[in-house]
Amino acid sequence: MSSGKIAQVIGPVVDVLFAAGEKLPEINNALVVYKNDERKTKIVLEVALELGDGMVRTIAMESTDGLTRGMEVLDTGRPISVPVGKETLGRVFNVLGDTIDLEAPFTEDAERQPIHKKAPTFDELSTSSEILETGIKVIDLLAPYLKGGKVGLFGGAGVGKTVLIQELIHNIAQEHGGISVFAGVGERTREGNDLYWEMKESGVIEKTAMVFGQMNEPPGARMRVALTGLTIAEYFRDVEGQDVLLFIDNIFRFTQAGSEVSALLGRMPSAVGYQPTLATEMGQLQERITSTKKGSVTSIQAIYVPADDYTDPAPATAFAHLDSTTNLERKLVQLGIYPAVDPLASSSRALAPEIVGEEHYAVAAEVKRVLQRYHELQDIIAILGMDELSDEEKTLVARARRIQFFLSQNFNVAEQFTGQPGSYVPVAETVRGFKEILDGKYDHLPEDAFRGVGSIEDVIAKAEKMGF
């Protein structure tokens, strides 16, 4: 095990000098610095660059407070390695695989795997055309998710990405009954804490491994924590042949941390100040999140859109890797429609008649057509009023508004805030409900009866309460 000395510390970047004759560590190797003689507390560094003359530049995975020039640094001879397997279920980790849930730490002989690996080869990959039911109407009808597929939840600040991902965990993890991995990447510690206790109370935690690298942690930890979660998921897929759910909140923070690290390493920034290696880093992560012949990984990723600008390089780079996109829209939040999913901007390659069936496809296409026409008529309505529309257009607008409200529903995870119980709506119920609205069966019911309800039966019950 070769050793070197700290030459300089610049925030989370640490330069280490190895004497002549010492073997230089490889890129991505983990180095260890002990903060005191008892060797109880250590800081892990990851090699990022080799500068020449025995000098390597590393990124710290923890705060560098207390490090000084001249301290000894040991090369572990391998990348950061984290615990994998059944022992990880029900536990909470940091980027290094250390437990942070105040329960017993892992033993030294626990199975570990390196977080840096190659993506599966082309001949190992497998695709599926089976739909993953979420119980959320707008998703199941207009942008359905594939088992073993990749889903992106796009949205600006405060439009409901984390609440939506928590509802998906609640619905899918409980219905799915398989193994789930949650990676909290650069998000609020409070949200992670809330999620942990909710999962503990519901019992889902027993089949879930959670990995956190939150906002307050150094960029190195935020950049690598997604790989830690992915490594745990890959083990269940490849070794145990499981169908795994991987939730990542938030992929943008992975890019943001990479941007910070890139600047600290002295690389020239690219478009909008992002790292020049943005597409490569995103590709290396996303290509590992895939389904193979041994098992599948269905990933649901929240993706923050800076200033609601979808042309920003970070969300634009992530777009290319996804099967389904669920776009959240601020205008719908302002209308009080939750989840604020934009039915026209969201898309899925699963919305095809050979996958969802002819009826589902036809209903979804007609819903989109009606909403698109309503969108086009809104300018006329704003300037001239409803009176200038033909009778046919007035009927279309009335149905479009009912559809828009019926696409909303109450969430189980938001019950403590709204006071309304959440609802899980099967796909068949969703398709039937929208088909009947399109056929004009409920034109006599008030628009408000369609807001924040589950199935079409709930609409009828709500209308009866309102006196209709």
Curated annotation (Swiss-Prot):
Per UniProt, which keywords does this protein have? ATP synthesis, ATP-binding, Cell membrane, CF(1), Hydrogen ion transport, Ion transport, Membrane, Nucleotide-binding, Translocase, Transport
Membrane topology is: Peripheral membrane protein
Q: Could you tell me which CDD domains the record lists for this protein?
A: ATP-synt_F1_beta_C, ATP-synt_F1_beta_N, F1-ATPase_beta_CD
Recorded hits in PROSITE patterns, A to Z, give: ATPASE_ALPHA_BETA
Gene name linked to the record: atpD
Root EC class? translocase
Q: What GO CC annotations are associated with the protein? A: plasma membrane; proton-transporting ATP synthase complex
Q: How does it assemble?
A: F-type ATPases have 2 components, CF(1) - the catalytic core - and CF(0) - the membrane proton channel. CF(1) has five subunits: alpha(3), beta(3), gamma(1), delta(1), epsilon(1). CF(0) has three main subunits: a(1), b(2) and c(9-12). The alpha and beta chains form an alternating ring which encloses part of the gamma chain. CF(1) is attached to CF(0) by a central stalk formed by the gamma and epsilon chains, while a peripheral stalk is formed by the delta and b chains.
Q: Quick one: where is this thing mainly located?
A: membrane
This one is known as ATP synthase subunit beta
User: Member of which family?
Assistant: Belongs to the ATPase alpha/beta chains family.
The residues that the entry says bind ATP are G155, G156, A157, G158, V159, G160, K161, T162
Recount the UniProt induction comment for this entry.
Induced by a decrease in external pH from 7.5 to 5.7.
Its UniProt entry gives the catalysed reaction(s) as: ATP + H2O + 4 H(+)(in) = ADP + phosphate + 5 H(+)(out)
Functional note: Produces ATP from ADP in the presence of a proton gradient across the membrane. The catalytic sites are hosted primarily by the beta subunits.
What's its EC? 7.1.2.2
- One MF term in the entry's GO annotations: ATP binding
Q: Which Pfam families match?
A: ATP-synt_ab (PF00006), ATP-synt_ab_N (PF02874), ATP-synt_VA_C (PF22919)
Places the protein is found: Cell membrane
Which HAMAP family does the record associate with it? ATP_synth_beta_bact (MF_01347)
